[in-house]
Amino acid sequence: MRHLISMRDIGREEILNILNESEKMEAILNENGHCDFLNGRILATLFYEPSTRTRLSFETAMKRLGGNVIGFTDISNTSVTKGESLADTIKVISGYSDLIAIRHPSEGAARLSSENSKVPVINAGDGSNQHPTQTLLDLYTIKREVGHIENLKIAFIGDLKYGRTVHSLCQALSLFKSVEIKLIAPDELKMPREVIEDIDGKLKLSEMTDVEIDDVDVVYMTRIQKERFVDVNEYYKVKGIYRLSKEHIGNKNVVIMHPLPRVDEIDSEVDNIPQARYFKQSFYGVPVRMAILKLLFEDSIK
């Protein structure tokens, strides 16, 4: 694995390898809190869009591996404001670092970065396209909290049009056997047809607008993303259309996930019930990103 840009680029065995490595990293965190696998190495974090969990978990992961971090979170302090192209920025920064993690508002920016980099590039989110490290931590959460990925029933609820985490996760789940997916969204925010066509026939798929979750293993809630709407009036038409409360949760074994940040789609009272795993899901971002950084670096020096 030279870069991690899209879930389409990696197969089932590579996914399982990353998940197995993540278990080792979690054990290290629980035992010692750190190791020296990437001692003296540098990760560049280039965040052209706001981020809390993804950026900080990448930085934490690199430091837990013994490495260091450089980067930016505010493009107004960079040469982007002078008109420097993304390709040129990557060519320069790949000379300063051993790995790059980039978040960018434009679809395809991570792919372009990988084509201009001397070092491995990790897509930390490119517009509404892909978010592969989130997908891998989601799969890890499912494996750890449900106990299995195959023979899985999962309901995705909310913004399935702009939600890059959902696009990536559906594509990854299509590689596993006997997966059933419910896509629950208003007409304005349905899953893009190209994603449906990509996964159709590989798993059991149903689309609906009403919330039906009593028979699923996982409920995956998503935020309605105001920043993705060209017309803000369209956002207000669907804002708050789905709100998960304790009354909706009749299945004591269901696992409730959310990529975060949350706005109003999950009542805060849900946080205190055992089915809520979204904060644990967020924690899993550290061992999973540790595994990704370690494996990518090892592959880059072979």
From Swiss-Prot:
One Gene Ontology term of the biological-process aspect is: 'de novo' pyrimidine nucleobase biosynthetic process
Instruction: From the UniProt record, give the pathway where this protein acts.
Output: Pyrimidine metabolism; UMP biosynthesis via de novo pathway; (S)-dihydroorotate from bicarbonate: step 2/3
What would be one Pfam family of this protein? OTCace
Swiss-Prot/TrEMBL catalytic activity: carbamoyl phosphate + L-aspartate = N-carbamoyl-L-aspartate + phosphate + H(+)
Task: Detail which positions bind L-aspartate.
Answer: K82, R164, R223
Q: What is its EC number?
A: 2.1.3.2
Q: Name one GO molecular function term.
A: aspartate carbamoyltransferase activity
State the top-level EC class.
Answer: transferase
- List each coiled-coil range: none
Q: Does the keyword Transferase apply?
A: yes
Q: Which InterPro entries match?
A: Asp/Orn_carbamoyltranf_P-bd, Asp/Orn_carbamoylTrfase, Asp/Orn_carbamoylTrfase_sf, Asp_carbamoyltransf, Asp_carbamoyltransf_Asp/Orn-bd
Question: What Gene Ontology cellular component terms go with this record?
Answer: cytosol
The leader peptide range reads none
Kindly list the positions annotated as binding carbamoyl phosphate: R53, T54, R103, H131, Q134, L260, P261
Q: Which family does it belong to?
A: Belongs to the aspartate/ornithine carbamoyltransferase superfamily. ATCase family.
**Primary role:** Catalyzes the condensation of carbamoyl phosphate and aspartate to form carbamoyl aspartate and inorganic phosphate, the committed step in the de novo pyrimidine nucleotide biosynthesis pathway.
Quaternary structure, per UniProt, is: Heterooligomer of catalytic and regulatory chains.
> This chain belongs to which protein, by name?
Aspartate carbamoyltransferase catalytic subunit
User: What organism does the record attribute this protein to?
Assistant: Methanococcus maripaludis (strain C7 / ATCC BAA-1331)
**Gene of this entry:** pyrB
